[in-house]
Every structure is written in structure tokens, then in C-alpha cells.
């Protein structure tokens, strides 16, 4: 992926990893659009990053996802990078009364949203790069967040297939695999002792400069590579031709 002179859309870009990525991409001389549900968060992001373009939308609504694509296709048809970053994580137990409602919300946000956006944004003639933000929990589930872990395992698997499916179109598919970081994902204060997002961003941008397509940090470097000497040749044989 070239690191400058792109036009980039980052979903969930008003906070956490998304906002940090937006800041770094802007520093690298890119035009960045962020979308999010809360106007207040978008306004705060705009105050921090005056050049960022903001778009309010509720990505859990199919109509809003389609409207976002239509707006980009009309107003920013030269957009060439999609970053599927939006996600939700909730602690839950299978015996909880609200388990299914929480699980449904995570499935919608973490699976349906990036699937639909990827399908639609592939129609943009300028699109040449997709970054999918998964998680180290895609490889080793954390039982406090069982559905989140499963959705990220799905998204990791889909990303592998997507990379092969769009190879002939010269579209690069990059997987961003964060560990727990000092953000409010899952709840305020849960990750106060985790590494800062800034360290993660520095690491993955160094890997982007090296041309890597799986961007890892800390323990995710280990878990994402476990068993790859067995997996990769089987994956290649299964999907050749």
C-alpha cells in the first residue's frame, strides 16, 4: 500500500484505533473521511483533526450503509482506500437474559457492516486497497467476549478469502490485527493497563512501509502465525485455479 496521496474512508473513525489511524494517515498527506454514529464524537475528532472529513451515519442500519456508499460514490468517487474498522465488544454470558440481543448487535456491527460495505465499495473504480481490522481474539477466543471473538474469527477468515477473490483486480487486502489496547472498547477502564494506541499505530505503519499484508503487534504476531506452516500450503492447494 502506498502511504501518501490516498483518499481513505475509515469506519468507526471518531475514536480509538480508527481516530489514531486517521491522524497518522493525515500526517502522511492523505485525505481522510471518517464516519460514525455520534455527532459529538465526530465534532471532537474534527476539532483535533481540522482537515478530516466527517460523515454521520448509523452503520447498524442497512439504509445508512447504502446511503454512505451513495454519498461517497457521488461526492468522493476517487476514494481508493476502505478501512473496515467499526466494531463493538460487549462482555456477556450465554445465560444472561440479554445475551441474544447483545450477540445480535455484535454480529450486525462486526460482520454485516463490513460485508455490505466491502461489497458496495468494490464497485468504486478507484478502489485499490481494503484494510480490515480484526483482532488477536480471532485466533484465541476470550470467553468473556465469546461472540466478539467469534465475529473476529469470521472476519479474519473472510479477509483471507477476499484477498484471493480480488487479486485479479489488483486490489490489495490488508489485515490489521490489534491486541488489547488502551481504548474504551468493551467498556471504560477495562484496558487502562494495555499498551497505548500510539505504539500500535507506529508499529503497523512501519509494517505497511515494508509491504506487509498482516499487521500485528505484541502477542498478535505470535498467535496469528501459529500453525501457518501447515495452514498456508493447504489454503493454497484448496484455492488454486
What residue ranges belong to the model's regions?
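Conserved glycine-rich cofactor-binding loop
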Residues: 7, 12-16
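Active-site helix of classical SDR
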Residues: 118, 151
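Rossmann-fold scaffold of SDR-type NAD(P)-dependent oxidoreductases
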Residues: 11, 79-87, 110, 132
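The beta1-alpha1 cofactor-binding region of Rossmann-like NAD(H)/NADP(H)-dependent oxidoreductases
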Residues: 56-68
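Conserved mid-core segment of classical short-chain dehydrogenase/reductases
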Residues: 66, 89-104, 144-147
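Catalytic Tyr-X3-Lys loop
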Residues: 88, 99-116, 131, 155
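Residue(s) in the substrate-gating loop at a strand-loop-helix junction
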Residues: 135
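C-terminal helical subdomain
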Residues: 175, 183, 187-229
Amino acid at each position: 500500500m502506498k502511504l501518501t496521496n490516498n483518499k481513505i474512508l475509515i469506519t468507526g473513525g471518531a475514536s480509538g484505533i480508527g481516530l489514531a489511524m486517521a491522524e497518522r494517515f493525515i500526517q502522511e498527506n492523505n485525505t481522510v473521511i471518517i464516519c460514525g454514529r455520534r455527532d459529538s464524537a465526530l465534532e471532537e475528532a474534527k476539532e483535533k483533526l481540522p482537515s478530516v472529513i466527517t460523515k454521520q451515519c448509523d452503520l447498524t442500519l442497512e439504509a445508512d450503509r447504502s446511503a454512505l456508499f451513495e454519498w461517497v460514490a457521488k461526492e468522493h468517487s476517487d476514494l481508493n482506500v476502505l478501512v473496515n474498522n467499526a466494531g463493538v465488544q460487549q462482555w456477556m454470558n450465554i445465560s444472561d437474559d440479554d445475551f441474544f440481543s447483545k450477540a445480535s448487535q455484535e454480529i450486525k456491527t462486526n460482520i454485516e457492516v463490513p460485508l455490505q460495505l466491502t461489497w458496495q465499495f468494490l464497485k468504486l473504480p478507484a478502489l485499490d486497497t481494503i484494510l480490515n481490522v480484526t483482532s488477536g481474539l480471532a485466533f484465541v477466543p476470550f470467553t468473556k467476549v465469546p461472540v466478539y471473538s467469534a465475529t473476529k474469527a469470521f472476519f479474519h477468515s473472510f479477509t483471507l478469502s477476499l484477498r484471493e477473490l480480488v487479486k485479479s483486480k489488483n486490489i490489495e487486502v490488508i489485515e490489521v490485527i490489534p491486541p488489547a489496547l488502551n481504548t474504551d472498547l468493551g467498556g471504560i477502564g477495562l484496558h487502562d493497563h494495555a499498551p497505548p494506541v500510539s505504539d500500535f499505530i507506529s508499529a503497523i505503519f512501519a509494517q505497511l512501509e515494508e509491504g506487509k499484508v498482516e499487521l500485528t503487534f505484541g502477542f498478535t504476531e505470535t498467535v496469528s502465525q501459529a500453525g501457518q506452516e501447515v495452514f498456508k500450503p493447504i489454503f493454497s492447494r484448496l484455492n488454486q485455479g
